[in-house]
């Protein structure tokens, strides 16, 4: 073995001493989690409001007040001098929703009975835009007039179909187990020429069913949507409402605002009827039942889709869908301010079958 000669004492060498370079740790970009199903890998994406969402940025209160003058008495300035409303006040929230629908979606009549769910328009609109993205990904030349959607639990507010019709021209069927919700949603449709002929409201007569009894034998749907009941009981729902109010009160006091109303005065914006808020077993049981029923309509529905409020329910839903034979599963996380929501979409048809679906012009 040849050993390199060491220089004698005092002898110069051509070697330069090694400089002590600072150790720089290479930053690794955290990749979004992926889920592989039948050869398809799908990333869980987190983002803010969708680029096509009309509600990015601050609310234009002068314009909103112009279309709904009653809103003016509910508008105030926050400590930063920005116009806002008291989001714990049910009347304020209802009037804001009405103004947003009139200004941005051309709705001429919209109302809900007292005590029914009054969802935030920006978040619901975001959901519809991301549904559109899913469809466009599979068919970039999508003719939106061919899209037929089914909203499970349309509610008295009819928000998903309203946004879907006015933004994309989709046709809808909205189902609900509550006759009052169906009656009010139907009134909204009948009172708006933009919605007439595009939305049909159907009563689900069996509360144990989701798709059964709604999807006809010869019907085909491009996509289904749902905002499932979150709680497992009325007591859980009431506790959840009180918790939201308590958090909102603390946040408003921190910002120097007046205390907000108590639970008895704030049912509307955080409230809702039984079917809107809770069911036996809560969200996990509901979406589990939805997964099982969806398999029965695997060839009649291109994409099934539902919101999931509890992140812990996502993994179980994925595993169940895999066992049921879902060919593709998408999980998308949406960040809207401090709130993180997510939805899961699945199809029992592979990529080639989905192409054939569009060629058949559902």
Curated annotation (Swiss-Prot):
Instruction: Note the SUPFAM superfamilies from the entry.
Output: S-adenosyl-L-methionine-dependent methyltransferases
The catalytic activity, as recorded, is:
adenosine(1618) in 23S rRNA + S-adenosyl-L-methionine = N(6)-methyladenosine(1618) in 23S rRNA + S-adenosyl-L-homocysteine + H(+)
Chief location: cytoplasm
Task: Give compartment(s).
Answer: Cytoplasm
This enzyme's EC code(s): 2.1.1.181
Q: Name one GO biological process term.
A: rRNA base methylation
Q: Which GO terms describe its molecular function?
A: 23S rRNA (adenine(1618)-N(6))-methyltransferase activity
In terms of superkingdom, the source organism counts as Bacteria
Where does this protein have compositionally biased stretches of type Basic residues? 1-28
Region (Disordered) residue ranges read: 1-40
Question: What cellular component terms from Gene Ontology apply here?
Answer: cytoplasm
Q: Which Pfam families match?
A: Methyltransf_10
Q: Which UniProt keywords apply?
A: Cytoplasm, Methyltransferase, rRNA processing, S-adenosyl-L-methionine, Transferase
Matching InterPro entries: METTL16/RlmF, rRNA_lsu_MeTfrase_F, SAM-dependent_MTases_sf
Summarizing the function annotation, the protein's role is: Specifically methylates the adenine in position 1618 of 23S rRNA.
Q: Give the protein family.
A: Belongs to the methyltransferase superfamily. METTL16/RlmF family.
Which protein, by its recorded name, is this? Answer: Ribosomal RNA large subunit methyltransferase F
């Amino acid at each position: 073995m040849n050993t390199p000669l060491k220089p004698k004492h005092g002898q110069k060498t051509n070697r330069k001493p090694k400089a002590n370079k600072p150790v720089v740790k290479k930053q690794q970009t955290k990749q979004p989690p992926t889920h592989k199903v039948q050869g398809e890998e799908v990333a869980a994406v987190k983002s803010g409001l969708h680029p096509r969402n009309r509600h990015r940025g601050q609310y234009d209160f002068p314009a909103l007040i112009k279309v709904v003058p009653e809103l003016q008495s509910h508008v105030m300035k926050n400590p930063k001098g920005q116009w806002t409303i008291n989001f714990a006040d049910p009347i304020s929230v209802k009037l804001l929703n009405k103004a947003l629908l009139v200004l941005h979606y051309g709705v001429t009549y919209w109302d809900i009975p007292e005590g029914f769910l009054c969802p935030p328009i920006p978040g619901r609109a975001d959901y519809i835009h991301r549904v559109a993205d899913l469809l466009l990904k599979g068919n970039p030349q999508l003719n939106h007039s061919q899209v037929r959607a089914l909203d499970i639990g349309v509610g008295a507010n009819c928000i998903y179909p309203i946004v879907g019709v006015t933004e994309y021209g989709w046709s809808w069927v909205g189902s609900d187990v509550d006759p009052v919700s169906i009656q009010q949603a139907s009134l909204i449709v009948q009172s708006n020429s933009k919605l007439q002929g595009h939305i049909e409201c159907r009563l689900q007569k069996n509360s144990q069913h989701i798709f059964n009894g709604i999807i006809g034998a010869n019907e085909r749907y491009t996509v289904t949507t749902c905002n499932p009941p979150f709680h497992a009981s009325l007591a859980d729902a009431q506790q959840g409402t009180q918790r939201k109010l308590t958090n909102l009160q603390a946040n408003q006091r921190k910002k120097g605002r007046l205390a907000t109303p108590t639970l008895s005065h704030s049912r509307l914006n955080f409230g809702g009827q039984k079917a809107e808020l809770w069911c036996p077993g809560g969200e996990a049981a509901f979406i589990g039942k939805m997964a099982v029923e969806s398999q029965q309509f695997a060839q009649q529905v291109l994409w099934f889709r539902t919101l999931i409020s509890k992140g812990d329910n996502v993994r179980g839903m994925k595993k169940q869908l895999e066992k049921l034979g879902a060919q593709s599963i998408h999980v998308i996380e949406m960040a809207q301010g401090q709130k993180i929501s997510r939805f899961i979409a699945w199809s029992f048809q592979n990529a080639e079958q989905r192409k054939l679906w569009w060629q058949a012009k559902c």
